[in-house]
């Protein structure tokens, strides 16, 4: 086999491969003989079909299969010979495929870049410390009660936290705009469900009151037509209702899966869930800083093929989130590559950097941490042991956990080198900052 390598630009390589005709013809001959033993043709007994007949009927197809197999095998043999690591599938350009002549083709592909790690000791990371207090638990229970609240109509002015039923019509320059009209719409004042100023403008109104609100849409509003636009909403209040919170009793606790132990057990489980959420948020906060520092401190030439693959992954994830059926619309038109380009490039960049850290630090997934992570995932289900068994028997899920654990180990490795400052914080501050990321 003859191989010549050319660096065309950046990460792109051009490999010219030549395979002796004898090798190809021998393999074609062997495939024809194998087909002759197995093929059934009318007028001949199975296994007794003349080779000339098989060649006439199936020769072209068999040759095509052999050429494909030879190209595939010879390509990977060639990249091993040249110590190359292809990133993505090659583009194959045939040069010579004629029978009886050496097979020759050109493979164009990208290779993985070399990543030179920066000095991890200069990273400055802020590690927040927080605990779940009794006050935090009280506040969370209040939130849970509000989620289970019932509403009773009242004959008084609306206040923050009340639910109003309204009709409204929005206009821009005196003309109604799309999506700006609704009848019998329930709205909790203070929920920030509407644009700034809308809910505050209804505080103090009673059933039957009418009011025109002069407001401005935010500059970052999703509709291009309404970004930063001055509008008016003509609002009619149909009714005002106040929340009636449920009592902390057995019926309430059962709604959250607490059958025994009363309020003490309920508080215990609420606190455990909050601690789990807080722990994950604290971990994510540190991890986010570490990953940002890695991206900022490294310049990596990312293979276009890997970015394209990651774009497709992100597009599929978005489709799954919104329940989109690909056959019903032009996916690439609705969700173009440009929508995911930046995030995909970042993910590929991080993957390459993290991979190099794993290699240089000789990190391997820690079995105890894998077990612990699976148990933590399982603890949120009604039958934890079934979930644990399912993860341990599913190689794809297990690989996902191993990857997550290895990434956590990379973060720990970086923290052991970096300048880390501990800062006291609160449950609310940590959880709010997580929601804003």
Swiss-Prot record:
Q: List the record's Gene Ontology CC terms alphabetically.
A: cytoplasm
- GO MF assignments: peptidyl-prolyl cis-trans isomerase activity; protein folding chaperone; ribosome binding
Keyword Iron listed: no
Biological process according to GO:
'de novo' cotranslational protein folding; cell division; chaperone-mediated protein folding; protein transport; protein unfolding
Q: Identify the residues that the record assigns to the PPIase FKBP-type domain, covering every copy.
A: 161-246
Q: Is Ion transport there in the keyword field? A: no
EC nos: 5.2.1.8
In Pfam terms, one family for this protein is: Trigger_C
Task: Print the keywords alphabetically.
Answer: Cell cycle, Cell division, Chaperone, Cytoplasm, Isomerase, Rotamase
Broad EC category: isomerase
What catalytic activity does the UniProt entry give for this protein? [protein]-peptidylproline (omega=180) = [protein]-peptidylproline (omega=0)
Q: What is its main location?
A: cytoplasm
Provide the protein's localization. Cytoplasm
PANTHER family named among the record's database cross-references: TRIGGER FACTOR CHAPERONE AND PEPTIDYL-PROLYL CIS/TRANS ISOMERASE, TRIGGER FACTOR-LIKE PROTEIN TIG, CHLOROPLASTIC
- Regarding domains, what does the record say? Consists of 3 domains; the N-terminus binds the ribosome, the middle domain has PPIase activity, while the C-terminus has intrinsic chaperone activity on its own.
Assigned protein family: Belongs to the FKBP-type PPIase family. Tig subfamily.
Q: Which NCBIfam families match?
A: tig
Q: What does this protein do?
A: Involved in protein export. Acts as a chaperone by maintaining the newly synthesized protein in an open conformation. Functions as a peptidyl-prolyl cis-trans isomerase.
Cross-referenced HAMAP family: Trigger_factor_Tig
**Entry protein name:** Trigger factor
Recorded source organism is Cellvibrio japonicus (strain Ueda107) (Pseudomonas fluorescens subsp. cellulosa)
Tell me the lineage of the source organism.
Bacteria, Pseudomonadati, Pseudomonadota, Gammaproteobacteria, Cellvibrionales
């Amino acid at each position: 086999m003859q191989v010549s390598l050319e660096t065309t630009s950046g990460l792109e390589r051009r490999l010219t491969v030549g395979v002796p005709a004898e090798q190809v013809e021998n393999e074609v001959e062997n495939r024809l003989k194998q087909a002759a033993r197995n093929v059934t043709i009318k007028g001949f007994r199975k296994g007794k079909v003349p080779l000339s007949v098989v060649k006439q009927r199936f020769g072209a197809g068999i040759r095509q299969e052999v050429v494909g197999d030879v190209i595939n095998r010879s390509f990977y043999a060639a990249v091993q010979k040249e110590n190359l690591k292809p990133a993505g599938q090659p583009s194959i350009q045939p040069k010579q495929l004629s029978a009886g002549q050496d097979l020759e083709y050109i493979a164009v592909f990208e290779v993985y870049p070399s990543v030179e790690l920066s000095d991890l000791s200069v990273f400055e990371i802020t590690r927040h410390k927080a605990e779940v207090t009794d006050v935090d638990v009280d506040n969370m229970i209040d939130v849970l009660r509000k989620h289970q609240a019932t509403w009773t109509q009242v004959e008084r002015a609306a206040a923050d936290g009340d639910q109003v039923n309204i009709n409204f019509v929005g206009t821009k320059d005196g003309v109604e705009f799309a999506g700006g009209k609704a009848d019998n719409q329930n709205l909790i004042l203070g929920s920030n469900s509407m644009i700034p100023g809308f809910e505050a403008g209804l505080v103090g109104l009673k059933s039957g009151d009418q009011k025109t609100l002069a407001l401005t849409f935010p500059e970052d509003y999703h509709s291009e037509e309404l970004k930063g636009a001055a509008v008016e909403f003509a609002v009619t209040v149909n009714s005002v209702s106040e929340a009636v919170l449920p009592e902390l009793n057995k019926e309430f606790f059962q709604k959250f899966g607490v059958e025994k132990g009363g309020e003490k057990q309920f508080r215990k489980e609420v606190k455990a869930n909050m601690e789990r959420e807080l722990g994950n948020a604290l971990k994510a906060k540190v991890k986010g800083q570490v990953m940002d520092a890695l991206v900022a401190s490294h310049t990596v030439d990312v293979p276009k093929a890997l970015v394209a693959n990651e774009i497709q992954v992100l597009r599929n994830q978005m489709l799954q989130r919104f329940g989109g059926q690909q056959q019903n619309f032009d996916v690439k038109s609705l969700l173009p590559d440009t929508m995911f380009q930046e995030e995909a490039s970042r993910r590929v960049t991080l993957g390459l950097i993290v991979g190099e850290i794993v290699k240089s630090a000789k990190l391997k997934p820690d079995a105890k941490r894998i077990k612990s992570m699976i148990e933590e995932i399982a603890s949120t289900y009604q039958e934890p042991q079934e979930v644990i068994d399912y993860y341990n028997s599913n190689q794809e899920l297990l690989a996902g956990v191993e990857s997550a654990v290895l990434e956590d180990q990379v973060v720990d490795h970086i923290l052991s080198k970096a300048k880390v400052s501990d800062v006291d914080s609160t449950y609310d501050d940590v959880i709010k900052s997580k929601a804003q990321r």
